[in-house]
Amino acid sequence: MLTIGVLGLQGAVREHIRSIEACGSKGVVIKRPEQLDDIDGLILPGGESTTMRRLMDTYHFMEPLREFAAQGKPMFGTCAGLIILAKEIAGTDNAHLGLLNVVVERNSFGRQVDSFEADLTIKGLDEPFTGVFIRAPHILEAGEDVEVLCEHNGRIVAAKQGNFLGCSFHPELTDDHRVTELFVKMAEKHKQETAV
C-alpha cells in the first residue's frame, strides 16, 4: 500500500490524512525527519509559512526534505506549503525549500476576511473543483518547465513541475478528494518507476 506523509508541524493535518485515506492510501503524520524514509510522497499543509519554516528549522527538517526531493519523491504544497516549496517569494530574498520553479506572492487574495470558495477548472479533472482559499498565496510567475494546472481570475493557483505539485487553495477542506488523488497518482507512478 502507498504511504503518504503529511508534515505535522502545524496546519490542517487531520483533514489531509482523511483525504489521503479516502483515496485508498495510508496517511501518516510526519513529526521527525527519519520518518521521511518510510513514505512514498509528502504533503506540506497550509498554516502560516514563517511559523512553519521556524518549526522546520527547530526540528531539523530542511536538509532531510531537500534529500527527500532529490530522491525524486513527490511533494505537494497547499497554501502555505506552496510558499515553502516555491523557488522565490515576491518581496523577499528568503525562499524556503526552493524546489518548485515559481514565484509566489503571499496573502495575495487579501486577509482572512477575504477567505472565499471558487469553482475551479483544473487540468486532469473532468468536473469543476471547489477551491477553498484562506489568506491564500498565488503564483505570480511559473518557469518554462512548470505546467500550469489552474487559474482563477487570471491568477495561477495550481501548478506542477516534475514530482512537485503546488496549489493556493486547501483541497483537504472539502469532501472532494480529486486533487489529493492527483498527488497520490504521482506518488504511485514514482513508486512503480523506481521499484527494483
From Swiss-Prot:
GO biological process: glutamine catabolic process; pyridoxal phosphate biosynthetic process; pyridoxine metabolic process
EC number: 4.3.3.6, 3.5.1.2
Claim: Lyase is one of the keywords in the record: yes
Keyword entries, A-Z: Glutamine amidotransferase, Hydrolase, Lyase, Pyridoxal phosphate
Pathway(s) served: Cofactor biosynthesis; pyridoxal 5'-phosphate biosynthesis
UniProt key word Hydrolase: yes
Coiled coil (UniProt feature): none
Pfam family, one: SNO
Binding site for L-glutamine: 47-49, 106, 134-135
Active site: 79 (nucleophile), 170 (charge relay system), 172 (charge relay system)
Similarity annotation: Belongs to the glutaminase PdxT/SNO family.
Protein name: Pyridoxal 5'-phosphate synthase subunit PdxT
Organism of this sequence: Bacillus velezensis (strain DSM 23117 / BGSC 10A6 / LMG 26770 / FZB42) (Bacillus amyloliquefaciens subsp. plantarum)
